[in-house]
């Protein structure tokens, strides 16, 4: 089959190539999926750059990509939830990445029937951003009436998170560029801060939750607007100190994580708030929940642009440019 493989770390043009590789061999708990569409996420170009070498070690070359939608070709003897012909969508784990390909074999617990009312391209846009939001909100026990600040509301995660937060009954503030103000309001944002018209730090705060999708200075600055007793949950900041313990990391990695996160923890202590970082895990049950939200009209996938399969390097570069409104999708079939 054809698949894009990562053969080293660095520039996209130098290390992402289309190759002929062996078809995946599914195990007894796996489903073999013919991929019709895959979506891109920032973690993909960060992986290419080598940003994740400390926390995710891969033997290269190897296929990569996390999100996919397609048709089940076969199911293992114990993969009784699915049958050939089922239209499904899935999120691969760190160990099973490889959705920028014509086929993938995944454990059945990573897979769900795709929402019935949408296309494969729209379904492929949902898994990582949807699971990230559901798992993140569950971890901080988000509930109706709380005030949440969602950074980058027009991005892939932001467009899903705004809709899901509104579904739960949270009071939603988001940041975006002035050209996207009406767009994020249409998704359900109560208040919008246009970052090209003013500094969000000067717009007040006292948020119960800050959902940090940007990292860098935004992670530390989040503690200037979160309320005492609140929580900053980050997808892009440094790993929290529990991460190394959860991963069973050695002392060298634990020291590295401590050094990476020291500024964040200092800001957290000063603000009297909690810092939470996590890596999303595949979850077919939650994908079924998301499918119900989509079919019920609570969530609508947002696609900025679709690229042909052979254009993955261009699609990664486009996403890395930071101007996508919603998700970038790869049409495999």
Q: Language-model segments: which ranges?
A:
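Glycine-rich beta-strand-centered segment in the early N-terminal region that forms part
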Residues: 22-39, 52-97
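Short glycine/proline-centered loop/turn elements that form peptide/ligand docking sites
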Residues: 77-78, 172-183, 216-218, 240-241
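NAD(P)H dinucleotide-binding glycine-rich loop of Rossmann-like/cofactor-binding domains
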Residues: 81, 90-152
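N-terminal Rossmann-like NAD(P) cofactor-binding module of classical short-chain dehydrogenase/reductase
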Residues: 89, 210-211, 233
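Mid-domain Rossmann-like dinucleotide-binding core that forms the NAD(H)/NADP(H) cofactor-binding site
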Residues: 126-197
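A short acidic, Gly/Pro-enriched loop at the edge of an enzyme's catalytic core
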Residues: 202-209
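Glycine-rich phosphate-binding loop and adjacent beta-alpha segment
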Residues: 218-296, 332
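C-terminal hydrophobic helical "lid"/dimerization subdomain
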Residues: 279-333
